[in-house]
Amino acid sequence: MDLDPHAGVQVGMRVVRGMDWKWGQQDGGEGGVGTVVELGRHGSPSTPDRTVVVQWDQGTRTNYRAGYQGAHDLLLYDNAQIGIRHPNIICDCCKKHGLRGMRWKCRVCFDYDLCTQCYMHNKHDLTHAFERYETSHSRPVTLSPRQGLPRIPLRGIFQGAKVVRGPDWEWGSQDGGEGKTGRVVDIRGWDVETGRSVASVTWADGTTNVYRVGHKGKVDLKCVGEAAGGFYYKEHLPKLGKPAELQRRVSADGQPFQRGDKVKCLLDTDVLRDMQEGHGGWNPRMAEFIGQMGTVHRITDRGDVRVQFNHETRWTFHPGALTKHNSFWVGDVVRVIDDLDTVKRLQAGHGEWTDDMAPALGRVGKVVKVFGDGNLRVAVGGQRWTFSPACLVACRPEEDANLGVAERARENKSAASVPVAGSLSVALDKLRTQKSDPEHPGRLVVEAALGNVARALDLLRRHPEQAGFHPAVDTKNQGRTALQVAAYLGQVELVRLLLQARASVDLLDEEGNTALHYTAMGNQPEATRLLLSAGCGVDAQNGTRSTALHVAVQRGFLEVVKILCEHGCDVNLPDAHADTPLHSAISAGAGASSIVEVLTEVPGIDVTATNSQGFTLLHHASLKGHVLAVRKILARARQLVDAKKEDGFTALHLAALNNHREVAQVLIREGRCDVNVRNRKLQSPLHLAVQQAHLGLVPLLVDAGCNVNTEDEEGDTALHVALQRHQLLPLVADRAGGDPGPLQLLSRLQASGLPGSTELTVGAAVACFLALEGADVSYANHRGRSPLDLATEGRVLKALQGCAQRFRERQAGGGGGVPPGPRHVLSTPNTVTNLHVSGTAGPEAAECLVCSELALLVLFSPCQHRTVCEECARRMKKCIRCQVIISKKLRPDGSEVVNAIQVPGPPRQLVEELQSRYRQMEERITCPICIDSHIRLVFQCGHGACAPCGAALNACPICRQPIRDRIQIFV
């Protein structure tokens, strides 16, 4: 039985009392609603594993059993607060699209669904049985008809409730001050992230704001006047802590469609006609397209799918009527699943499995070929493997932008060069075999292709000058002039002859190339000098906006590059992709290092140039692993070392993501970059190195001072990431393909005295290393899960705890290591405890770890450690055992120890003034158009906008002045 991971207990869920309830009126009575704010964890005496802490709307905060001792005290009422959504499902009563929370599907009627609110309000026939879906992936649970079942009224923070500030309040005096009341005017979702997770409150002074009631597990409000929130059927709600099973088969039509997907309708006409009601309607002509392949054009606001079958025919379909033909196509960015046993099983008969494929598990790659049997050729980690599509999951396109897949660079380069070279070669062959009139002016191009200088001169003499111009000299044959052909072939004498005959040096071929482009294509330095001496345009751009310098750089022709630079070409001109020649040189790899040196020595080069993907030259060099380019750019502009792309990635992020260890060393040692910089997802370079299992980079970043306890937007530290990913990927040092990372990591683990290191998986090895360096094994993420909770295998759990203990011993002995940064856990000091782990006795006199006196030790909250006496505890701010910030200090009798010095907080007026300044600063750097991104472009008038908005403007949106120039800034 596979459990649905999305249906597990998570902070933010809204709950009511369940069948095993024995805690009196702690919830305010039957029907009271609360929010899960903390999950139990291994080793905690008050909130052990399989328990939860609930913040009830009326104010009580207590822990309850969610499978502990086999009991379930709570029922799940709503899980929309944790982001559960059924994307293509519409409630057939309230017509809300993208049903949030649990889905209730009628077993009698065809395709009839209700949301939780409509189901509990007795919508639809009460004699019909329904199925309950906890998530879009879970297997349905069959329920009895609602008729005759008791309904319990809900009470708590709902529309109309009277509220005051609650336990997680952090909004200053927005409510008018402590004790002021407000009225809930609406319950809504937080943008598109979560549903029914925040409350809009109007306070007594008339101000209205939105506050968390379950969003991210936080509760900003306390109910002092309950409001009715509808009803619920107790028998139909799932037990909290008993997750639903995964569907055995997730069909393609159950997945959300995306533009470009290839789909078919495989239903009978009668079934399709019934399904189309309310989903685009039915047209008899639609029957003609049943079984035909179509392409998803767009998804409508209602979730229906608009499918294009040819240039003129489009139909709107119910999403359930369509089947994806193939989820992956050439160029798609995919991630290989990291479950070793599953991949081995799925590969049988689909490319098979070899142990050399192990490094690809969990990595991101690109589809380079789709075979007829549906199997895929995927480029990943510098290798190409054949995978079953079942082994792959789709990734967002932006992940590809930051991944320097070697195959992509080679494909892009060849795609840019082969068609031109190929078509030119074909044209030359045709010219050399052409049977044409010897007197025809186009014959001059043929003689140029054959290299016949004498016959070319004879042709020019037969066509005398007219007004100082030879009419034959610029005649085209196969789309090219004689000068262009001679320039490509390096026929210096012929080029000189044609120039003397006043051939046009800047005449364009069908692709916009001049003769100078042709000398660059053919690697002809002398012909290049001749054309430049004749006054040709050194910066002429072809149809792809490439200059001759771009062409020479892309083909690696060093001498031509030198000549063009000597003649003052513009090294900063961008092509159609906004790539400068230096971008192209970096893409060419180590083979173009000499060209990189030449370009970076040009006095006027702009090393801050950014291409269409938002990569500066330093970003691009870090992406491609070009060490020389990184050094040269840093020597000119070290201030770029921490510059961020739109997604927040810096050069170090890109080096860490793509396993460019030497680049990372240069950025850290020579560039002195910030090793703890974070992107828009709040990921540090260490997060990315661990995510991609780059074992050589992890120690480098840690040794450079990277904070091992930094959390991302999900609250995950690098230790969480290590245990969530690569858990089943074996750590094999001798198959690392020359990568010393696994061997170095193993040697450091073995040096610490960790036994059995050679049998560790990649995830476990990285996790143990991080724990040895001070990563907090008890750090709870936003879902309340600590690394100890994720270490499901007993051997790994024991090793992790041992490494953490070794770090603490090393710290106590004055050894090295990175101390864990200060943090706050999800526990709250006013939590009442219902449960105690059996076997824990009351405190007795023990030796204080600080003064060594025998005394009753103080209990620290939330970590629950007793380490010091009352006198020593007064001045402590962090527990000396686990480094967790202390929120409360309790004597054995339960009374609270007062701190030695109570530092007064800042005056309210000062706080408000600082808040006002912050808002003003934020407004000054925020784009005035989308009011979302930061300003990245400044216009000549002094106003600005973000890059996407600014690129589309012709006039300043503030002062209406025409925009003549855009200056990119780095904030």
From Swiss-Prot:
Location of the MIB/HERC2 domain = 1-80, 149-227
Q: Which InterPro entries does the UniProt entry name for this protein? A: Ankyrin_rpt, Ankyrin_rpt-contain_sf, MIB1/2_ZZ, Mib_Herc2, Mib_Herc2_sf, SH3_15, Znf_RING, Znf_RING/FYVE/PHD
Coiled-coil parts of chain: none
- Supply one GO CC term from the record: early endosome
Q: What is its EC number?
A: 2.3.2.27
Q: What is the recorded function of this protein according to its Swiss-Prot or TrEMBL entry?
A: E3 ubiquitin-protein ligase that mediates ubiquitination of Delta receptors, which act as ligands of Notch proteins. Positively regulates the Delta-mediated Notch signaling by ubiquitinating the intracellular domain of Delta, leading to endocytosis of Delta receptors.
What is the protein's name according to its record? Answer: E3 ubiquitin-protein ligase MIB2
User: Which source organism does the UniProt entry give?
Assistant: Rattus norvegicus (Rat)
